[in-house]
């Protein structure tokens, strides 16, 4: 995110010359350990969106989220790569069968550029659309110009998809996504 948004912590220093940073590519965040002269090393975290990195010694703590699980505090041991989900923000109480998992989409735009989006298909195990029917589509665009969309659990999107709507969340050009 942009540096003029207060409180963002996309990177932290570990005190021994390493930087632990969030890198975003193709709509997914990764946690990287960066050292001078060495290829960056990824700490694999089961999430699509990461934020607010803190490091003490060889332990990093980050907020991690995905499309079907609430945001959680995650602890990562930088030496061993062991990752532990410490606590989720809330209990969801929804059967995952009703949660739509987004698909990353790329499409061409003006000037030979590429734009990105997340497509959330309708998801409800109790309903089957008639053959040949296409669902109504809701298109969402984030507030910009330096914001981006994400794949964090969004109950508003899930409300649409569980009721038979498809949703496309566009990450338009010029944004940080």
Q: How would you name each of these model-derived features?
A:
Residues 1, 39-44:
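A short beta-strand motif characteristic of beta-propeller blades
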Residues 1-6, 22-31, 47, 64-72, ...:
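A flexible loop/linker signature enriched in serine peptidases of the S9 family
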Residues 5-12, 153:
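Beta-propeller blade termini and top-face loops
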Residues 8, 16, 134-135:
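Phosphate-coordination loops involved in phosphoryl transfer and adenosine-cofactor binding
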Residues 13-16, 55-57:
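Residue-level detector of Asp-centered blade-edge/turn motifs that repeat once per structural unit
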Residues 16, 25-28, 37, 70, ...:
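Surface-exposed loop/turn positions within WD40 beta-propeller blades
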Residues 32-35, 77:
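Structural recognition of the beta-propeller blade-terminating site
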Residues 51-177:
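Serine-hydrolase catalytic core recognition
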């Amino acid at each position: 995110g942009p540096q003029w948004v207060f409180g963002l912590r996309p990177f932290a220093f570990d005190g021994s010359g390493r930087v632990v940073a969030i890198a975003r590519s193709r709509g997914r965040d990764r946690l990287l350990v960066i050292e001078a002269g060495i290829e960056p090393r990824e700490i694999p975290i089961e999430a699509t969106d990461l934020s607010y990195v803190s490091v003490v010694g060889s332990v990093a703590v980050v907020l991690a989220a995905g499309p079907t699980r609430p945001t959680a505090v995650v602890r990562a041991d930088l030496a061993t790569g062991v990752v532990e989900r410490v606590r989720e923000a809330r209990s969801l109480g929804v059967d995952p069968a009703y949660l739509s998992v987004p698909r990353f989409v790329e499409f061409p735009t003006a000037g030979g550029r590429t734009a990105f989006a997340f497509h959330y298909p309708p998801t409800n195990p109790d309903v089957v659309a008639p053959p040949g029917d296409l669902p109504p589509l809701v298109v969402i665009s984030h507030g910009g110009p330096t914001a981006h969309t994400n794949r964090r659990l969004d109950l508003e999107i899930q409300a649409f998809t569980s009721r038979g709507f498809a949703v496309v969340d566009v990450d338009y050009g010029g944004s940080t996504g």
